[in-house]
Structure formats: C-alpha cells, structure tokens
Design a protein with these regions (language model features):
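Acidic/His- and Gly-rich active-site-bordering loop/insert found
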Residues: 1-99, 117-124
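Catalytic metal-binding/acid-base residues of hydrolase active sites
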Residues: 18, 69, 78, 136, ...
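Short beta-strand segments
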Residues: 65-67, 130-132, 165-169, 193-195, ...
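Short, conserved micro-motifs enriched in small and acidic residues
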Residues: 94-107, 120, 208-211, 361-368
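Acidic/histidine-rich catalytic neighborhood of metal-dependent amide-processing enzymes
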Residues: 102-183, 382
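Metal-dependent amide/peptide-bond hydrolase catalytic core
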Residues: 170-175, 182, 188-383
Length: 383
C-alpha cells in the first residue's frame, strides 16, 4: 500500500534545499496545488524563493505556512545514511535532513488539501499556502517579503485577509499533538560597547576600567524586572549575556573598551522600545559612556483562546485522545511575521526531538496522523 504523504516527503527531502536554496521544492508543491485549482504567485526577493497560493473566493481563509529550506547537515560521516537520500528505517522512521523540520509537515498539508477538496470541492471557506526558502537563515526576504506584500494589498482591499494560520513547525514533544504553539516570545539583541580609558594597571588613578564598568552594568541588567505586569501565557522576560570581549592580551594593560553581546526573550508584557529605554536609563544612572547596536529579530505574538485554538484542541482530542498543551515555549519562528496580519495562528507539527541534529527523522505513522489532523482542522474551520 502506497502512502502519498511519505512519497511527497521523500521527494522533498531528495532536494538539497539548504537556506536560501529552494532546490525546486516549491515547484513540486506548486504543481500539486495547481492541479487542485489553486492560483499560484511567486513573490521571490533577493534570491529567496517564496510562494503564495490561494483557493476559493469567499468565506474565512485558512492559511498553511512553512518553509522548504533546511539547516546544513553537519559532518556527513556522522550520518547513518546520506541526509538527502530519504531512508525508511526498520523501526518505522523516515530519516533525512528536513524530515521533521519541516518537509514532512509540508507533505502532510498538501495531501490533506488533496483529500479535503476531493470530498468537498466547494468548501465554505478559502485555503492558502505561504511558503518560503528563507526561514532557517536570516529570514529577511522570505515570509517577511510575502507579508509585506499582503499588507499592501489588504490596505488597498485587493487581497482578502487571513483568518486562521497553521504553521507546520515541529511543535510536538513526545507524542504527535501533545504540544501546540499558540505564541512565541520576542527576541531583542544588543551589542554594547563600554568605553573607558586605557592605561597601566599600576596607575589606577589614570585609567577608567571598562571591564569594571561593564560588570556593574551587566549585574544591573541581570537584576532588572523587564515586564510591566505578570503574564498568564509567557514566562518572565529573560536577559542573557552570550559574549564578552575585552583586553589587549597583556596582563599590565587596562583596555580602553569592553564589548558584550546580549539577548532578551520577551513577552507581550513589554516591548522592545521599553527595554531599550530601560537599558539607556541604567547606563545614564551608572554615569558611564557606552554605545549600543540594537537588532530586533522578532516581536512576540500570542493567539489567545478562540476559534482556532478551540478547534485544534477538539480535533487533536478526537483523533488522538490527547489533551494538548497550548504553549508559548521554544524559540522564534516565521509565525512572528504572519501574526502581524492579525490572524489567529498556531504551530502544529511533528515531534521535534531530532530537528537540526544528525540523523533527523520522523515517525512514518505520524505522517498520516498529521495529515489527518490538518484535514480535520480544514473540515472544522472551513468545511
């Protein structure tokens, strides 16, 4: 017996689509969608491949979102088999780069649409796909580019809004469907340089040690409460230092500068602007000279309990018997960009235990189950 989800997942894994190379994955998917009657549009930018595909003319829109790109393989010698030759293992897994993150989700989405539209050729709502080859890398010309175009069109009333979005990121922890992401923390990065006065360590009155200054600043940053108020959905905002650089290499020289990189993972209880202002205030209070380079890599988003989360919990319970955990844990995803469109958004995909690792794999039985979950959500939301 053939398994169409497995076959499509294998076809996608064979394509060496390391960011930002799509390697023809969108053509494979687009061909399948076009046969169903989808209207296809490529919104490529700066060498990144992006696909926007739509079906239907009326009713609420359910969007499937994801990425065709994968992370590098690492040392090929460590793999049990070629990462771009899909391998079915004896214990029932599909192995290959992208098997879990997230070519299996893409295959499940496409096949779910095929089966759904075969049974309901005229659904009560619309379906769309937003796919990119730039999620694992800089993520500056992928989903961002499509969202920017959709924002322009929606402002001009030339494009209908997305009502519900399912991102196929591998959200599950131990069993398919046990965790569904309903939000993600924002991520703010800073490169802070503390300026002092270089000199000989034997003459402290003639130097201003920036290492000491940076240490005081870091201690204050660690001890700061960054949130306006407690949040029922997210943990408190976290601050972490990831790199520190200082010194000339000599033991008798106080350096002129100390630089460190740091990151805030923040919830909807604060904003990047508020964090930046608080840091500037701390520096002023300490009376030090410092320069800062800021980089906001993602705003936080949250889908509160509503139509999509309710439907998702019910479909998972009906098909698997699991009471799913609606979570905001984990890192960032392209959901942070799509959420700007104002839609209800979740992330639902396979078990994430092996993502980005050697011998990445997904349970073959889960491919069928995931397809059925996606199909069940289409039936409940736009059927």
């Amino acid at each position: 017996m053939t398994c169409p989800v497995l076959e499509l997942a294998e076809e996608l894994i064979r394509r060496e689509s390391v960011t930002p190379n799509d390697a023809g994955c969108l053509t494979v998917i687009g061909t399948r969608l076009e046969r169903l009657g989808f209207q296809l549009e490529r919104i490529d930018r700066q060498g990144v491949s992006n696909l926007w595909a739509t079906f239907g003319q009326q009713g609420p829109m359910l969007c499937f979102a994801g990425h065709t790109d994968v992370v590098p393989t690492g040392d090929l010698k460590e793999w049990s088999s070629d990462p771009f030759i899909p391998t079915v293992t004896q214990d029932g897994y599909l192995r290959g780069r992208g098997a879990a993150d997230m070519k299996s989700s893409l295959a499940a989405m496409v096949v779910a649409c095929e089966e759904f539209l075969e049974q309901r050729p005229n659904p009560a709502g619309r379906i769309s796909f937003l796919l990119t080859s730039d999620e694992e890398g800089p993520a500056t010309d992928g989903t961002v580019a499509v969202v920017e175009e959709l924002e322009k069109r929606q402002a001009a009333a030339s494009e209908p809004a997305i009502d519900y979005c399912i991102v196929g990121e591998p959200s599950s922890k131990d069993t398919l469907g046990d965790v569904v992401r309903v939000g993600r923390r924002g991520s703010l990065n800073a490169f802070i340089t503390v300026h002092g006065t270089q000199g000989h360590v034997a003459y402290p009155e003639l130097v201003d040690n920036p290492i000491h200054g940076a240490s005081r600043l870091i201690a204050d940053l660690v001890g700061t409460d960054w949130d306006d108020e407690p949040n029922d959905y997210f943990p408190p905002t976290s601050f972490q230092v990831s790199n520190i650089n200082a010194g000339t290499g000599a033991t008798n020289v106080v350096p002129g500068t100390t630089a460190f990189r740091c990151n805030w993972r923040f919830s909807t209880s604060t904003t990047a602007e508020r964090i930046e202002a608080m840091v500037e205030q701390l520096i002023d209070t300490l009376g030090m000279e410092a320069s800062i380079e800021w980089n906001l890599s993602g705003e936080p988003f949250l889908t509160t309990h509503g139509t999509l989360t309710s439907a998702t919990a019910k479909v998972i319970k009906a098909q698997t018997g699991i009471e799913t955990d609606l979570s905001t844990g984990g890192g960032t995803s392209d959901g942070r960009f799509i959420a700007k469109l104002g839609c209800e958004l979740i992330e639902l995909g396979p078990i994430n235990r092996s993502i980005h690792k050697i011998d990445e794999e997904v349970k073959i039985d889960d491919l069928l189950r995931l397809k059925d979950l996606y199909k069940g959500l289409m039936t409940k939301l736009i059927g």
